[in-house]
Amino acid sequence: MHWYRKILNQQVSGLHRSNLKNQGQFAKKRIANGYEQPHNVKYWSIGNENYGAWEIGAKEADEWSRLVLESAKMMKHVDPTVQLSAAALNDPNWNLKLLQKAGNFLDWISIHVYFDGLQNVFDYAPSDYETMMGRTGKIAGSISRVRGTLAMLGLEKKIKIAYDEWNPRGWHHPGIHTNLGYGLENDEYLKVRDKNDTNSTYTMADAVFTACFLNECIRNCDVVQMANFAPMLNTTGPIYTYDGGNVKRST
Protein backbone atom coordinates (compact mmCIF):
# COMPACT_ATOMS: atom_id res chain seq x y z
CA MET A 1 0.00 0.00 0.00
CA HIS A 2 3.03 2.30 -0.09
CA TRP A 3 2.10 3.53 -3.58
CA TYR A 4 -1.41 4.31 -2.34
CA ARG A 5 -0.11 6.46 0.50
CA LYS A 6 2.29 8.19 -1.87
CA ILE A 7 -0.55 9.18 -4.23
CA LEU A 8 -2.53 10.66 -1.36
CA ASN A 9 0.49 12.60 -0.08
CA GLN A 10 1.12 14.05 -3.54
CA GLN A 11 -2.47 15.22 -3.83
CA VAL A 12 -2.48 16.89 -0.45
CA SER A 13 0.92 18.54 -0.91
CA GLY A 14 -0.51 20.63 -3.76
CA LEU A 15 -3.31 21.82 -1.50
CA HIS A 16 -0.80 22.71 1.23
CA ARG A 17 1.25 24.71 -1.25
CA SER A 18 -1.74 26.53 -2.68
CA ASN A 19 -4.05 27.26 0.22
CA LEU A 20 -2.22 27.19 3.56
CA LYS A 21 -0.76 30.42 4.89
CA ASN A 22 2.55 29.16 6.26
CA GLN A 23 1.92 25.71 7.74
CA GLY A 24 4.12 22.90 6.51
CA GLN A 25 7.02 22.57 4.09
CA PHE A 26 5.03 23.11 0.90
CA ALA A 27 3.44 26.39 1.99
CA LYS A 28 6.89 27.54 3.05
CA LYS A 29 8.26 26.62 -0.39
CA ARG A 30 5.59 28.81 -1.97
CA ILE A 31 6.62 31.70 0.25
CA ALA A 32 10.29 31.11 -0.57
CA ASN A 33 9.40 31.27 -4.27
CA GLY A 34 7.95 34.75 -3.87
CA TYR A 35 4.26 34.13 -3.11
CA GLU A 36 3.74 35.13 0.50
CA GLN A 37 -0.05 34.97 0.42
CA PRO A 38 -1.88 31.69 -0.30
CA HIS A 39 -3.61 31.32 -3.67
CA ASN A 40 -6.82 30.06 -2.05
CA VAL A 41 -7.82 27.84 -4.96
CA LYS A 42 -11.45 26.86 -4.38
CA TYR A 43 -12.11 24.08 -6.90
CA TRP A 44 -10.12 20.85 -6.92
CA SER A 45 -10.69 17.79 -9.07
CA ILE A 46 -9.57 14.35 -7.94
CA GLY A 47 -8.31 12.50 -10.99
CA ASN A 48 -8.94 12.77 -14.72
CA GLU A 49 -10.86 10.16 -16.71
CA ASN A 50 -9.54 7.40 -14.46
CA TYR A 51 -12.14 5.02 -15.87
CA GLY A 52 -10.29 4.99 -19.21
CA ALA A 53 -7.54 2.58 -20.25
CA TRP A 54 -5.83 5.49 -22.06
CA GLU A 55 -5.08 7.13 -18.71
CA ILE A 56 -1.96 6.32 -16.72
CA GLY A 57 -3.43 5.48 -13.34
CA ALA A 58 -6.71 4.06 -14.62
CA LYS A 59 -8.76 2.25 -11.99
CA GLU A 60 -11.72 -0.09 -11.68
CA ALA A 61 -14.74 1.56 -10.07
CA ASP A 62 -14.29 -0.09 -6.65
CA GLU A 63 -10.63 0.86 -6.44
CA TRP A 64 -11.27 4.36 -7.74
CA SER A 65 -14.07 5.09 -5.29
CA ARG A 66 -11.84 4.11 -2.36
CA LEU A 67 -9.00 6.33 -3.58
CA VAL A 68 -11.40 9.25 -4.03
CA LEU A 69 -12.79 8.77 -0.53
CA GLU A 70 -9.39 8.82 1.13
CA SER A 71 -8.19 11.74 -1.01
CA ALA A 72 -11.29 13.77 -0.24
CA LYS A 73 -11.04 13.09 3.50
CA MET A 74 -7.45 14.30 3.57
CA MET A 75 -8.12 17.37 1.43
CA LYS A 76 -11.15 18.44 3.43
CA HIS A 77 -9.09 18.01 6.60
CA VAL A 78 -6.41 20.35 5.25
CA ASP A 79 -8.90 22.95 3.98
CA PRO A 80 -12.60 22.38 4.76
CA THR A 81 -13.61 25.23 2.42
CA VAL A 82 -12.46 23.60 -0.83
CA GLN A 83 -14.97 22.31 -3.38
CA LEU A 84 -14.09 18.78 -4.53
CA SER A 85 -15.02 16.92 -7.68
CA ALA A 86 -14.06 13.44 -8.85
CA ALA A 87 -13.75 11.83 -12.26
CA ALA A 88 -16.97 10.16 -13.35
CA LEU A 89 -18.87 9.49 -16.58
CA ASN A 90 -22.33 8.83 -17.99
CA ASP A 91 -22.37 5.32 -16.53
CA PRO A 92 -24.76 4.73 -13.62
CA ASN A 93 -22.81 1.69 -12.42
CA TRP A 94 -19.51 3.60 -12.15
CA ASN A 95 -21.15 6.66 -10.61
CA LEU A 96 -23.15 4.59 -8.13
CA LYS A 97 -20.03 2.97 -6.69
CA LEU A 98 -18.19 6.29 -6.57
CA LEU A 99 -21.02 8.17 -4.89
CA GLN A 100 -21.92 5.44 -2.44
CA LYS A 101 -18.34 5.41 -1.20
CA ALA A 102 -17.26 9.05 -1.44
CA GLY A 103 -20.41 11.09 -2.08
CA ASN A 104 -20.55 12.60 1.40
CA PHE A 105 -17.15 14.24 0.82
CA LEU A 106 -17.77 15.51 -2.73
CA ASP A 107 -19.35 18.73 -3.97
CA TRP A 108 -19.23 17.97 -7.71
CA ILE A 109 -19.21 15.04 -10.07
CA SER A 110 -16.89 15.63 -13.04
CA ILE A 111 -17.96 14.41 -16.47
CA HIS A 112 -16.18 14.75 -19.82
CA VAL A 113 -18.18 14.40 -23.04
CA TYR A 114 -17.10 14.55 -26.70
CA PHE A 115 -19.85 13.70 -29.13
CA ASP A 116 -18.05 13.29 -32.47
CA GLY A 117 -15.50 10.54 -31.95
CA LEU A 118 -12.66 11.90 -34.07
CA GLN A 119 -10.19 10.45 -31.60
CA ASN A 120 -11.15 6.99 -32.84
CA VAL A 121 -10.57 7.42 -36.59
CA PHE A 122 -7.56 7.86 -38.84
CA ASP A 123 -9.24 9.93 -41.56
CA TYR A 124 -10.17 13.41 -40.37
CA ALA A 125 -13.81 13.73 -41.38
CA PRO A 126 -16.05 15.59 -38.92
CA SER A 127 -19.64 14.38 -38.97
CA ASP A 128 -22.07 16.18 -41.25
CA TYR A 129 -24.93 18.43 -40.16
CA GLU A 130 -27.61 15.74 -40.13
CA THR A 131 -25.49 13.37 -38.04
CA MET A 132 -24.63 16.03 -35.48
CA MET A 133 -28.25 17.12 -35.19
CA GLY A 134 -29.16 13.50 -34.53
CA ARG A 135 -26.69 13.45 -31.68
CA THR A 136 -28.36 16.38 -29.95
CA GLY A 137 -30.86 13.82 -28.68
CA LYS A 138 -28.13 12.29 -26.51
CA ILE A 139 -27.58 15.45 -24.50
CA ALA A 140 -30.69 15.30 -22.32
CA GLY A 141 -30.16 11.61 -21.62
CA SER A 142 -26.58 12.24 -20.58
CA ILE A 143 -27.71 14.71 -17.95
CA SER A 144 -30.75 12.75 -16.78
CA ARG A 145 -28.75 9.58 -16.10
CA VAL A 146 -26.38 11.41 -13.78
CA ARG A 147 -29.22 13.36 -12.18
CA GLY A 148 -31.08 10.11 -11.57
CA THR A 149 -28.13 8.52 -9.79
CA LEU A 150 -27.73 11.57 -7.55
CA ALA A 151 -31.44 11.52 -6.73
CA MET A 152 -31.44 7.80 -5.96
CA LEU A 153 -28.73 8.36 -3.35
CA GLY A 154 -30.31 11.51 -1.94
CA LEU A 155 -27.40 13.64 -3.14
CA GLU A 156 -29.14 15.84 -5.72
CA LYS A 157 -29.15 18.82 -3.34
CA LYS A 158 -25.52 18.34 -2.30
CA ILE A 159 -23.56 17.36 -5.42
CA LYS A 160 -23.62 19.33 -8.66
CA ILE A 161 -22.68 18.17 -12.15
CA ALA A 162 -19.57 19.69 -13.71
CA TYR A 163 -19.07 19.16 -17.42
CA ASP A 164 -15.52 20.40 -16.95
CA GLU A 165 -14.54 19.11 -20.40
CA TRP A 166 -16.95 19.06 -23.28
CA ASN A 167 -16.87 19.69 -27.00
CA PRO A 168 -18.96 18.65 -30.00
CA ARG A 169 -15.74 17.13 -31.37
CA GLY A 170 -13.34 14.61 -29.98
CA TRP A 171 -9.62 15.32 -30.24
CA HIS A 172 -8.22 13.96 -33.51
CA HIS A 173 -5.03 12.16 -32.51
CA PRO A 174 -5.25 8.79 -34.29
CA GLY A 175 -3.68 5.88 -32.49
CA ILE A 176 -2.51 7.83 -29.47
CA HIS A 177 -4.63 5.84 -27.02
CA THR A 178 -3.08 2.58 -28.18
CA ASN A 179 0.39 4.05 -28.80
CA LEU A 180 0.24 2.62 -32.31
CA GLY A 181 -0.09 5.82 -34.28
CA TYR A 182 -1.08 3.71 -37.30
CA GLY A 183 2.61 3.09 -37.98
CA LEU A 184 3.32 6.77 -38.59
CA GLU A 185 6.65 8.42 -37.84
CA ASN A 186 6.55 11.46 -35.57
CA ASP A 187 6.56 14.07 -38.33
CA GLU A 188 3.87 12.19 -40.27
CA TYR A 189 1.75 11.76 -37.16
CA LEU A 190 1.89 15.48 -36.39
CA LYS A 191 0.61 16.31 -39.87
CA VAL A 192 -2.40 14.06 -39.33
CA ARG A 193 -3.04 15.43 -35.84
CA ASP A 194 -2.78 19.03 -37.04
CA LYS A 195 -5.84 18.56 -39.23
CA ASN A 196 -7.71 19.68 -36.10
CA ASP A 197 -6.55 23.17 -37.06
CA THR A 198 -8.35 23.20 -40.43
CA ASN A 199 -10.72 26.11 -39.82
CA SER A 200 -12.90 25.45 -42.86
CA THR A 201 -14.19 22.23 -41.28
CA TYR A 202 -15.89 24.09 -38.41
CA THR A 203 -19.43 24.66 -39.63
CA MET A 204 -22.98 25.46 -38.57
CA ALA A 205 -23.22 21.89 -37.26
CA ASP A 206 -20.72 22.79 -34.53
CA ALA A 207 -22.53 26.03 -33.71
CA VAL A 208 -26.01 24.53 -33.48
CA PHE A 209 -24.84 21.53 -31.47
CA THR A 210 -23.04 23.84 -29.04
CA ALA A 211 -26.21 25.90 -28.61
CA CYS A 212 -28.26 22.76 -27.97
CA PHE A 213 -25.81 21.53 -25.33
CA LEU A 214 -25.71 24.85 -23.50
CA ASN A 215 -29.51 25.18 -23.62
CA GLU A 216 -29.88 21.74 -22.05
CA CYS A 217 -27.43 22.75 -19.33
CA ILE A 218 -29.54 25.85 -18.66
CA ARG A 219 -32.70 23.73 -18.46
CA ASN A 220 -30.96 21.67 -15.78
CA CYS A 221 -29.12 24.53 -14.11
CA ASP A 222 -30.24 23.46 -10.66
CA VAL A 223 -27.78 20.56 -10.94
CA VAL A 224 -25.53 21.39 -13.93
CA GLN A 225 -23.55 24.36 -12.67
CA MET A 226 -20.31 24.08 -14.60
CA ALA A 227 -19.78 23.57 -18.34
CA ASN A 228 -16.26 24.23 -19.62
CA PHE A 229 -15.61 24.04 -23.36
CA ALA A 230 -12.34 22.20 -23.96
CA PRO A 231 -10.05 23.38 -25.34
CA MET A 232 -10.71 27.11 -25.71
CA LEU A 233 -7.77 27.91 -28.00
CA ASN A 234 -6.57 26.08 -31.12
CA THR A 235 -6.88 22.34 -31.78
CA THR A 236 -10.69 21.95 -31.55
CA GLY A 237 -11.28 25.20 -29.68
CA PRO A 238 -13.69 27.99 -30.67
CA ILE A 239 -10.79 30.41 -31.18
CA TYR A 240 -7.85 29.66 -33.45
CA THR A 241 -4.79 31.87 -33.05
CA TYR A 242 -1.87 32.34 -35.42
CA ASP A 243 0.83 34.93 -36.05
CA GLY A 244 -1.48 37.12 -38.12
CA GLY A 245 -4.42 37.21 -35.72
CA ASN A 246 -7.21 34.86 -34.77
CA VAL A 247 -10.20 33.05 -36.23
CA LYS A 248 -13.54 32.80 -34.42
CA ARG A 249 -14.84 29.40 -35.42
CA SER A 250 -18.46 28.30 -35.77
CA THR A 251 -18.94 26.82 -32.31
What are these regions (language model features)?
Residues 3-6, 55-66, 97, 130-137, ...:
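Alpha-helix capping and helix-loop boundary segments enriched in small/acidic/polar residues
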Residues 43, 118, 133-137, 236-237, ...:
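Solvent-exposed, flexible loop/coil residues
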Residues 26-35, 68, 72-95, 137-169, ...:
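Aromatic-lined carbohydrate-recognition surfaces of secreted/lumenal glycan-active proteins
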Residues 19, 102, 150, 221, ...:
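Active-site catalytic pocket residues across diverse enzymes, especially alpha/beta-hydrolases
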Residues 162-251:
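Aromatic/acidic polysaccharide-binding cleft in carbohydrate-active enzymes
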Residues 27, 55, 130-133, 233-234, ...:
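Generic, ordered loop/turn and secondary-structure boundary motif
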Residues 117, 121-198:
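A compositional/structural signature marking long, glycine- and acidic/polar-rich segments
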Residues 1-124, 144:
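N-terminal catalytic cores of secreted or lumenal carbohydrate-active enzymes
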